[in-house]
Amino acid sequence: MIEGVRQSGCEKRIWRHNDTAHLEELLRAAAPNRPKLIVFETLYSMDGDVAPLQRICDLAERYGAMTYADEVHAVGMYGARGAGVAERDGAMDRIDVLEGTLAKAFGCVGGYIAGKSTLIDAVRSYAPGFIFTTALPPPVCAAATAAIRHLKSSNWERARHQERAGRVKAVLNAAALPVMPSDTHIVPVMVGDPEHCKAASDLLLAEHGIYVQPINYPTVPRGSERLRITPTPYHDDALVDALAEALADVWDRLGLALNRRPRNDHEQISTVHCRIRALPVMTLKRHDAL
């Protein structure tokens, strides 16, 4: 998404993470007749927090802006039919373009955008990234279609996924591991050093047979390196406990800091809104910039 902003060549303004007051300042400063596109994620994959969708849409309507929402980490996992956070929060009909992926909840490869037919036709006609990309093979499309149909009608996976994520957070917190709070399925464990982060991931795999993705700069700012854990509906209590024991062993071997006061399994996990990341407001120079 950010690469698309860069490739467009459009003027851009960066608004502070989830700070809708700052977003309104930038929108108010733009000429009323200037085409504007607000670009944001619905669920932030590194911290697990969620964008204030309704407020963003309110501002878009007030200042004549379009909206582009990245639902890559939400489709299949949120909403009554798995359409994402926008569906869950009742904002799907207020967002102009929704971006999603087939590579996460749906277990395939590829991605998509959804919007009004005239807008999608414009992208088909003018976007070189689409025009010069080979189409997905029919077997992949068939597999993705089957996965989408299943998750549209089955809520078991979504409910179980959330329950498992909550269980992982509770067990890791009880072990005094530095879990970053969130109310989504993303479970970041703070390390704060790139070499230790990579070493922790390597030890987990080599010594315990557990693969956890290390997240280093430039994916996250320097000093906020972390392990990002994403449990599935099929990780049972025994596997969760094994993960906690493995992480405790790795933390001890690397001399990493633990939380001073462990939380128990029943302590509520609250949401923290990260103020580090920022996303662009892209102002189109002309309508045919698509």
Where do the model's predicted regions map?
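Substrate-binding/gating loop at the entrance of the active-site cleft, primarily
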Residues: 1-8, 21
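Helix C-cap/helix->beta junction micro-motif
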Residues: 8, 62-63, 175, 207-208, ...
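Active-site phosphate-binding strand-loop segment of PLP-dependent enzymes
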Residues: 13-69, 232
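Conserved PLP-dependent catalytic core of the aminotransferase class-I/II
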Residues: 51, 145-211
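Conserved active-site segment immediately N-terminal to the catalytic lysine
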Residues: 64, 83-102, 121, 125
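Conserved core segment of the aminotransferase class I/II
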Residues: 97-99, 106-155
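PLP-dependent enzyme catalytic core of the Aspartate aminotransferase-like
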Residues: 207, 219-290
